[in-house]
Structure formats: structure tokens, C-alpha cells
Amino acid sequence: MWEAIKDRETGRIRSNSFANRFKSRRILSLQLSNRKDFVSPHRGSVNSLQVDLTEGRYLLSGAADGSAAVFDVQRATDYEASGLIAKHKCIFTVDKQHENGHKYAISSAIWYPIDTGLFITGSFDHYLKVWDTNTAQAVVDFKMPGKVYRTAMSSMAMSHTLIAAGTEDVQVRLCDIASGAFSHTLSGHRDGVMSVEWSTSSEWVLYTGGCDGAIRFWDIRRAGCFRVLDQSQTQLGFRPPILKRTAVGSKLSSVAKSSLGGQNRLKTLQSKQTGSQSVKGSSSAKASVEKSRQKRIHPGMLSTLDRATAHYGAVTGLKATNDGMYLLSAGSDSRIRLWDIESGRNTLVNFETGRIQTNKGIQLDTSDDPALVFVPCMKTVKAFGMWSGRTTLMLRGHYESVNTCCFNSNDQELYTSGSDRQILVWSPGGTVEDEMVQDEVAEDKDNWSD
């Protein structure tokens, strides 16, 4: 550690690489925190977690008992064990006893991306509600045609305040906070929509995953989806071609090259004669193929591409990377796939097998450096390498199925919740405070041996 600090002072390593090195070291040492504890007020499984995008300080949770709570991640409300364990109780909670509370389970709870003055909850009681954080009162509500599975708002929107809602209905609805009405609906799925995710590179692009196994890309400024992901369409044909000159070919003698020169000249003369005839035919053929492709991809026409599937089952989770280049998806077939957003192709990253819940949606999250994917896998949380698919971390601590993963990039902490009604904190191990505690414990020990 001190050597790295010295290298940073002398200029041997840059500041960003120095910070990334320590962040990656902290993330790879995540373990169940013995210094921070959230006191959960929920009496049902916790289905949603999110840290606010402005300060990274307030944690919002939604549970199956119809309650939503807000926690302060940085400031503890109480201390135990001589100040070693920080207890974080909720700042306030909204439950069924509230006059505007939800009657049934809350499936999604998200922050308003601009500030912490508003938050949004979606419930199985067919309502989506917008809450004022300061007064804990519902200011806007939207009546949905069915159970609300997932809600999302764009973190980079400057021209709209739309909430995308995925319900058990086949249509995705966009709710406008400013007008208090539905902006428009997106039709294309053949079953309920279990996951929605906004693009991190464009405020107009929305990704949806349905129970029909399809992942659709929408531009909300136009009618119809402009892309349907197909798990059989891979990047194999889009990779750079193999170089013709190999190591063996480069060792050919000059005599052999000269002998082949005459044959190559004859071939070039023949190709010039036949090339002029074939160019016209090939150009017309390419044009016809491109026209047919455009016709098939057109959103208003039914085709085989429109019925493509990304998973053999429902799409239970979606997560776009922070750079906006890749999309992660999880399905009820217990598969995780990484998609290239620009081409819409499967990158064929082979994530190691793990059981994923099939009857409800899950919440994925990612870290940038190192590039990890945190996935709820039944009672455990697995961190996969985004490019290798290998299991880097396996976190055990929940007694029942894990529903959500929420990574706090400011403190390099991971928050998870499950059907055991608990919210657990996973913090980096090997910190200076942990070493001090170990030293104090070692001083209290005697020197007697057994």
C-alpha cells in the first residue's frame, strides 16, 4: 500500500490508475460487514433496492408487505458493542396504514434521478405512485391495467420526465409526472413485461424484457420497436478476419515467391477480364439483399425477426452498463447473457451456471473497475467477471432467496435483500479499522497455550 502511495507521489503511476487499483482491491475483498447493520422495518420479502443517484447516501427499499423505507447509508442512528457496530434505522417508512399506502406488495421502488425530493413505487395493487420525500405523501398516482412488475426512469433525461412501467399487461406504459397522465404505450410483447431499463447513452431509448422471452429496443419518439434481440445471432461474423499471411507463409524463400509470381500475374489478368462482368451482377444482388433486410426489420411488419427470443423463458432482469455499450440480461432459464447494444448481437460470454429465481423479477447490478456483475442466485450472490463469465466472488449470508443487488460505487459497498426480510451490507475487508480491532483483541488474549 505504502509503495503504491510513494509511486503516486513520485509520478510513476497516474492518479486514475492509482484510484482504480485501490477500488478494485476493495471490491474483490467484499465480505459480510461486521461494522454496519440495517435494521429492517419490513415484514415481507424485500423486492427492490436503490441508492440515490445524486448523493449516493440514501437507500430506498420496497417490500412485499406494501411498505417502503428510506435509510441513511452514511450516518448511523445508533451504535452497539462499544461503538464498533453502526446501526442504521430507517428515516421514515410508508406502509399499509398510511392513507396513501399500497394495499399489496411493492415490486419496484426507485428514486427520482435528479434529486431525492421524489421517489416512485409500483405495486401489485395495480397502482404506480409518486411520493414527496419531505412530506411522505403521494402526489401523483397512475392506475395500471395489471400488477406492476418493474419501473424505471432515465438517469440522463433532459427533455422528459417519463416513468416506464412494465406490468402483467402486454403493453409498456410511459407515465408523465408533469401532466399526471400516460404519455403513450409501447405495443409488441406477447406476454407481461417483467423488466424495463433505460439506455445510459440516450434518453430516448428503452429496453424491455417480457415473459415471452423477448428483449425489445424502443425509441419512444417513433412507433414500434426498432430491434428484437435474438440469442442465435452472435458476433462470430462481425469479428475481424483472420490475416492471410501466417508465420509459415512468411518463411517462404525468395525462389518460391518468384516462381509463384508468374502464376499470380496470369490470375490477375483473368480476374480483370471477368471482374467487369461480375461487378454489375454482384452490386445488384447486394442491393436486393439490403432492401429485403430493411423490409424485414421494419417495425410495422411481422417477420421471423419479430418473434425472436433472447431467453428460453421469461426475461427476469435487465441491466445496462454505465458506458451504454452493453446490456446484461437474466432469464428464468437460469442464463445470463451479455449483448452488444450497437449490433444487437449475443457476445457469447459463457457465464458459469447458477440457479436463478423463475417466478419473480430480480435486480442485477455492475461495477466498473473491475468489471463485475452481481447476480442473485437463490440464497447466494455471485459476482461474475463481465468478460470472462467466471465466478469471482460468492457471497453467502441470506437465509432465503436473494431478490436484489445494489452496488454503491462511492463506498464500494454492496447491498442485498431477500425473502428473509433482511437487508445485508457487504463491505471491503482488510481495512485499517478491522486491523485495529484485531490488534485490540490480540492484546486481551493471554499467552497460555493448551
UniProtKB/Swiss-Prot annotation:
Which InterPro entries does the entry link to? G-protein_beta_WD-40_rep, Rad28/ERCC8/Ckn1/ATCSA-1, WD40/YVTN_repeat-like_dom_sf, WD40_repeat_CS, WD40_repeat_dom_sf, WD40_rpt
* Compositional bias annotation for Low complexity: 271-287
Q: Which PROSITE patterns does the record cross-reference, listed alphabetically?
A: WD_REPEATS_1, WD_REPEATS_2, WD_REPEATS_REGION
Task: Report one GO cellular component.
Answer: nucleus
- Any one Pfam family match given in the protein's UniProt record, by short name: WD40
The residue spans of each WD repeat are 41-81, 101-141, 148-185, 188-228, 310-349, 397-436
**SMART domains in UniProt:** WD40
Subcellular localization(s) per the UniProt record = Nucleus
Covalent S-S links between cysteines = none
What is a biological process (GO) this protein takes part in?
Answer: transcription-coupled nucleotide-excision repair
Q: Can you state the subunit structure given in the record?
A: Interacts with DDB1A.
This molecule's function is given as: Involved in UV-B tolerance and genome integrity. In association with DDB2, is necessary for repair of UV-B-induced DNA lesions.
Q: Please identify the protein, giving its name as recorded.
A: WD repeat-containing protein ATCSA-1
Query: What are the top taxonomic ranks of the organism?
Result: Eukaryota, Viridiplantae, Streptophyta, Embryophyta, Tracheophyta
